[in-house]
Amino acid sequence: MKLTAEQIQANWQKFLANIKEHISGNRGEQLLNFYKRYEERIILMPAAHKKEYHNAFPGGYVEHVNRVVAASLKIYDVWCEFEMDKSTFTIEELVFSAINHDLGKMGDEENESYIPQTDKWRRDKLGEDYMFNKKVPFASVPDRGLFLLQSHGIQYSFNEMLTIQTHDGLYDEANKKYLFAFMPEQKPRTSLPFIVHQADLMAARVEFEREWLPKLKGKQGSLDKLKENYTLGTTPNSSKKLSTKTKALSSMKSDGLKNMLDKL
């Protein structure tokens, strides 16, 4: 999978629009300022380091987050239809949690988490187009994301903290203390974490199906061929329309970002 420059730009505008529409007051401004500060990094981030995972290509992170936001709002309606207690959280908390659920993947203020893999063998044999940046101290994705928010003065509610912390559900052993409880007083007192987890799970699954099901059916060559590095742009995209790309690039203020996207 490879996104064009205009697709990446459109996804970024949608990402910012979600903040403007759903995050109110001073916190909304703080969140916009935070993401604009790290725009050149976040706009090209992959959602994962390995192409067998979901959206492991430039721009994959923002596309994934947008999908999780949209899915969260749809799944909210389903839960409401089945008589969920809507009074336990707000739509703003829902969207804030979805937007920031994977924020920890950006790394720290100085260094990005995912950098291009330098080991050819690992790229070709293990499908690792990216590797983890050793300059970034270890932290789980939820912990780092919450730290980044608070270190930039962006406040979050208990509901939002719990949801970001547990968005991987019981796939993450660390979440058992919150989700694997039997006593009523120990269970989450809102359905918000379950909605965002289901949205994230569905988004990742859809992204897997889009990338891999046609290939596994043999429509695009053998699996050995599919192990080749393709997500970082080794396969040219002949469908690009220069005029559309030029229009997308012309709307950007950052010369550095224009240069990066122009090479896609």
Language-model segment annotations:
Residues 1-47, 51:
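Non-catalytic interface/linker regions that flank or bridge core catalytic/transmembrane domains
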Residues 1-18, 198, 202, 212-222:
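N-terminal leader/capping segments at the start of a protein or of a new domain
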Residues 32-90:
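A glycine-rich, hydrophobic loop/mini-helix early in the fold
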Residues 54-57, 63, 75, 81, ...:
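Divalent metal-dependent catalytic cores for phosphoryl transfer on phosphate-bearing substrates
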Residues 223-225, 229:
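Catalytic or ion-coupling anion/metal-binding cores of large enzyme and transporter domains
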Residues 227, 241, 245:
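Intrinsically disordered, low-complexity mixed-charge segments
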Residues 229-236:
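Extracellular secretome segments
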Residues 245-264:
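Short linear clamp-binding motif
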